[in-house]
């Protein structure tokens, strides 16, 4: 049976496609997909556009139900989906955040250039591999007691920095300064605590990675200078989230939300969009637990940052400060946040769900660090193991077009099982090494699942985002060494 989506799409311009409100019963607004014509053909190959239409049925939704060009099918919301609901009349949906709450990306800068980094890449990767636990069920080097973990859930990255695992200025370069308000550890189950207490400081599995990169192209020298980026610079990109803790939080509250749908007589075309009014007890319990998981993820990336710095110190025999290892920025791409946005000339308080989408606030936004406020925030977009990553800058138009949101990566075009089958019998590590990318992984299966062909062309995704006015490219960086599960 074909999984092609044959619903209506109206071309607005080269970069935007509309799903009309009358496409299906229950839609309260239109769906809007950011893509070019070639990508639309790919996007129609699964049911992700149907999920865009389903999200448009959420009570209290305002603006469009949005999808970024890296859209693909997910749980409830499509991955690459953005949906904003009114705080006072709308709902919150765990399917709009996903299981890996605050899966996100952090980039650490260095003062090194490639001629210093490339000869040391094997030593660096080996040291990192032995310093940072990775893989399914991996356990961290530090075990946290329940009271200590509760502090992490409230204070996020700050709790880790206060224990000596970071610099005081680190938190200034993290979205929400690494600690989102509203956390309530009493909303978190005992099972989530058990899963989380040994997983802080771990990379995890699947598409999570740690990558050493070098800056290959600068598109905007002025903003690159403000970001502290220069040609040939060595960067480190960390991509991970809240591990088993966030997964358990989502699992626990999905069950609650299923019952809440009946309680509040909410009817939706997909039970995976289970939700509750934001201000209901169920909505608030989920939001408080989700914030705990988001703070857990920021703490996780902070611990990993400490061990990255430590690893570089060992290999180069210089201090991390001397190596210029400050944080460029840290962004979440699976999260629901309370934000104010202008809709039809009114400022509205909204719950913005971003699932596989990155905040891309433009210039002048008070939530941004002082350093970036005049130009817009860094938007960190990983590609695949073979092609590299982009660092973008949020644009003013994104505030009008997408609730200040952009893409989060390349987006899959093959399922993990399809990728695994297509790569059978190949030595992926050798293929990447021939391209100058050293890879170290616990599992060859992960490398097969994460082959470059499993992903869209990140350059094409970024072009759409830029042409649509959501974020503009500042820097392109290529990998020289990648650590996976």
Regions found by a protein language model. Give the residues of each.
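A glycine-rich phosphate/pyrophosphate-binding beta-strand-loop-alpha-helix module
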Residues: 106-126
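Domain-length cofactor-binding catalytic modules of enzymes
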Residues: 1-51, 61-64, 75-77, 87-96, ...
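Active-site beta-strand->loop segment that positions catalytic residues and contacts the acyl thioester
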Residues: 57, 73
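Redox-cofactor-proximal catalytic regions of oxidoreductases
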Residues: 82-109
